[in-house]
């Protein structure tokens, strides 16, 4: 199911079209409601139970999905790094809110969701995936021939490894720190002190699975 994590463009535009799944087909742009309705449509079409969840307290919407008879939270909006990085978020997808329990999504130790209202008396108590391997991965995770693939990037030098992970959790490197990722050196400035600047790296290289092959891009290709 992780391969079905869609990457749309989040917007703060409050037009009604962006509150619906149609916004995705119109111009690939949605608000939280559009994200949740799109994901529900995709998963239910594929036979994966998925429901729409709201929080009036947060004025926010996301999903719960059922895996092996248990329900988990999925919030694509919070995992859309465009919200925090804007146009610098190209090719980046977070997974911090993917298949999480209620405890992991709320409270001081969670991801600050509150006022959750689950339909049909559903609870999301299972913690199986709260500490899953994808938590720290900010790239797409394609599935090719039954194996997961993702980019492990060294943000200090923008070199990256492509990691293969099988269904048993065994990992191996497809390439070892060979490629320089497409990236950018960013500056964070203190608006009250022009000399107070902090530098950090972000990376953009996409990783895509298609027809049982992996495709990626770096600064040389």
Name every feature range the model reports, one short phrase each.
Residues 148, 214-216:
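Hydrophobic beta-strand segments that make up the repeating blades of beta-propeller
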Residues 24-35:
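Extracytoplasmic/periplasmic, Sec-exported soluble proteins
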Residues 1-24:
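Secondary-structure boundary elements
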Residues 152, 218-219:
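Recurrent small/Gly-Pro-centered beta-turn motifs in extracellular repeat architectures
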Residues 33-100:
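Hydrophobic/aromatic-rich core segments of domains that either
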Residues 70-183, 201:
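His-Asp-centered catalytic microenvironments across diverse enzyme cores
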Residues 205-214:
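Repeat-blade elements of multi-bladed beta-propeller folds
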Residues 188-191, 200:
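Blade-loop segments of beta-propeller domains
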């Amino acid at each position: 199911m992780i391969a079905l994590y869609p990457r749309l463009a989040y917007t703060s535009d409050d037009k009604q079209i962006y509150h619906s799944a149609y916004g995705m087909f119109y111009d690939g742009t949605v608000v939280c409601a559009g994200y949740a309705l799109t994901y529900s449509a995709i998963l239910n079409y594929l036979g994966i139970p998925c429901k729409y969840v709201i929080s009036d307290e947060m004025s926010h919407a996301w999903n719960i999905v059922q895996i092996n008879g248990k329900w988990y939270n999925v919030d694509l909006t919070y995992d859309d790094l465009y919200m925090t990085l804007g146009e610098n978020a190209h090719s980046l997808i977070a997974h911090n809110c993917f298949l999480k329990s209620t405890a992991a999504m709320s409270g001081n130790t969670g991801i600050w969701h509150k006022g959750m209202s689950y339909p049909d008396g559903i609870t999301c108590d299972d913690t199986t995936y709260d500490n899953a391997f994808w938590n720290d991965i900010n790239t797409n995770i394609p599935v090719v021939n039954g194996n997961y693939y993702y980019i492990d990037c060294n943000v200090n030098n923008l070199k990256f490894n492509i990691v293969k992970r099988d269904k048993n959790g065994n990992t191996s490197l497809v390439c070892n720190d060979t490629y320089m990722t497409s990236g950018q050196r960013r500056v964070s400035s203190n608006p009250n002190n022009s000399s107070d600047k902090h530098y950090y790296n972000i990376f953009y290289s996409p990783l895509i699975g298609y027809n049982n092959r992996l495709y990626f891009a770096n600064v040389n290709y």
